[in-house]
Amino acid sequence: MLLLAALLCGCGTDENSGEDVRAHYENISGFSAHVKILSETNDFTMAFELDYAYNKEDVDVFTITGPESVSGVSGSIAGDSEATLALQYDDLVLDDARPVRPGMTPADAVFGVVCALRDTPADESWRESADGTALTVLHYRSESGDETIEKLVWLREDNMQPVYAELFADGTRELSIRFKSYQENGG
């Protein structure tokens, strides 16, 4: 739906932005972010907040900060797009908690977005503006089993920092991610 709205509002395309973004994310060593994730599956909607640290050379780590019922659960993600996920709360560790649909759960959605930005050519890109901020929007589409997975990612045009992302399965939005803070560690 957002793609259709972008096309109807006459937003211009930017053919080079996808490759520029890939180069940028291939060269950063890491970042830290605070994100809000809205998970919408079937008739159930739940909001999560988490602190996420991406480390190109090691494992990514996150800690859920909300809602209170799961606050303090932490996790680590190691590898690439076929990563392993471990969850931990106090002394209890659940190793290899790999989701059935990698990149489509609140625990590994940020990781899935980073993998797309870093490793995958965007299927299309265009420019938008929100609240006076110029944004680059990237659209990724892939097949996973018998379903189509799509990711839309909005980045600030001036520094390529992620602002927002939406993840779809077979045309239905299942996750939205709002980056509330973001700080790169360097290249």
Where in this protein do the model-derived segments appear?
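Glycine-centered tight beta-turn/hairpin loop motif at sheet-sheet or coil-to-beta transitions
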Residues: 43-45, 57, 68-70, 89-92, ...
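One face of beta-strands
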Residues: 31-37, 44-54, 58-64, 73, ...
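N-terminal leader/targeting segments and the immediate start of mature chains
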Residues: 6-56, 69, 186
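Short, exposed beta-strand/loop patches in secreted or surface proteins that constitute
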Residues: 23-24, 50-55, 75-76, 123-131, ...
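Gly/Pro-enriched, hydrophobic low-complexity segments
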Residues: 63, 124-187
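C-terminal low-complexity, charged extensions that often adopt amphipathic alpha-helices
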Residues: 98-137, 148-149
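Sec-dependent signal peptide recognition
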Residues: 1-4
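An acidic-aromatic
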Residues: 54-112
